[in-house]
């Protein structure tokens, strides 16, 4: 068996990566400071992966929302909270990665939904960690606020010099995944019902990022096409 293709460059839109090896998203609190910027540990962590030869590196999920959901106690990765600090650390990180030819796509999430107490969901459904409590349902205005913050974060990331982003979408039961599943989305407006409506949030994020950042800005979307959990498909 030949593995030659794994070591060949790959072009994704305007972004060229030196090989087919990538580092998947990983969330570690130590990689960021209290204001969401990359910490010294974070800079060293990602630089080590680039030095090791990975062509593409994904960050753990950033959570842009500072208006609707409460700040989760273990998640400080909110670029819009202190954008100047975030940009300074990002520029330094990209300089380190460029030395090895590696590219990075920051992952951006619409939110936790039922996975974090106090957060909003597509519908009034039980929280995962405490099913005795029901999560409040997002209003249409709140959905728009969340989408707008996703787009604003993509614009900030482009200004930092990142070639694109990955939207943390239909994966592992987080908010966009909850919107996609009729099992959790009981809405009767434009964001519920038919599959097209349940995917509307993801589509509006994709279209909004492309409109704001340009067609040459790479937008990856993390999708799990099948969930091996009862009632999730």
Predicted stretch roles:
Residues 1-233:
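Flavin-dependent oxidoreductase catalytic cores
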């Amino acid at each position: 068996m030949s593995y030659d293709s794994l070591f060949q460059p790959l072009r994704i839109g305007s972004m060229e990566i030196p090989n087919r090896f990538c580092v998947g998203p990983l969330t570690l609190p130590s990689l960021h400071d209290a204001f969401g910027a990359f910490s010294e540990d974070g800079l060293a962590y990602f630089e080590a992966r680039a030095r090791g030869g990975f062509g593409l590196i994904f960050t753990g999920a950033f959570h842009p929302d500072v208006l609707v959901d409460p700040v989760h106690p273990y998640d400080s990765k909110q670029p819009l909270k202190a954008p100047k600090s975030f940009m300074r650390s990002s520029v330094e990180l990209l300089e380190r990665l460029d030395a090895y030819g590696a590219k990075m796509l920051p992952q951006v999430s619409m939110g936790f939904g039922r996975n974090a107490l106090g957060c909003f969901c597509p519908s009034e459904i039980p929280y995962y960690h405490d099913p005795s409590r029901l999560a409040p349902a997002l209003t249409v205005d709140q959905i728009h606020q969340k989408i707008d913050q996703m787009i604003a974060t993509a614009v900030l990331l482009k200004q930092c010099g990142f070639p694109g982003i990955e939207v943390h979408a239909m994966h592992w039961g987080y908010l966009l995944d909850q919107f996609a599943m009729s099992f959790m989305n009981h809405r009767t407006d434009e964001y519920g019902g038919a599959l097209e409506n349940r995917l509307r949030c993801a589509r509006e994020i994709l279209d909004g990022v492309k409109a704001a950042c340009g067609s040459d800005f790479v937008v990856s979307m993390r999708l799990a096409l099948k969930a091996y959990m009862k009632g999730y498909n």
